[in-house]
Each structure stands twice: as C-alpha cells, then as structure tokens.
Swiss-Prot record:
This is Conotoxin Asp7/Gla(3)-TxVI. The keyword Nucleotidyltransferase does not apply. The modification 6'-bromotryptophan is found at residue 64. Belongs to the conotoxin O2 superfamily. Coiled coil: none annotated. It is found in: Secreted.
Length: 73
C-alpha cells in the first residue's frame, strides 16, 4: 500500500512539472518565430539617418530626399 502511495505521489509530481514546462513553451515559440532583422536591415538602420537629420546630398538620406540641408520624407 505504501509503495502505491509513493508511486502516485511521484506520478503527480512528474505530471505537474510537465504541465509547468508546457506553459512556458508557447512563449519561447513565439519569441523564436518572431521576425528577426537581417544583417542588411541592421546595417541600413545604422547607415540611414533620421528623416530630419542634416544632409548635403540625397544619397545620405537613403530613401528620403535632401532638401534645404535636411532629409525630407
């Protein structure tokens, strides 16, 4: 009888730990499956100024224009 009680307690502990681990998995999957920026996107973010930053040529503003010394959208 005592062995049966111990076996049931061990089974209950294992099931509860499995349930706790499964609760954490969806968050990890969401984080893993979320869109990550490519190296090119990270590089462009570093190279491209804000659209209000000063400039002297349009190529300094990436996809914006340089007008009156500032990047314009």
């Amino acid at each position: 009888m005592q062995k049966l009680i111990i076996l049931l307690l061990v089974a209950a502990v294992l099931m509860s730990t499995q349930a706790v681990l499964q609760e954490k998995r969806p968050k990890e999957k969401i984080k893993f499956l979320s869109k990550r920026k490519t190296d090119a996107e990270k590089q462009q973010k570093r190279l491209c100024p804000d659209y209000t930053d000063p400039c002297s040529h349009a190529h300094e503003c990436c996809s914006w224009n340089c007008y009156n010394g500032h990047c314009t959208g």
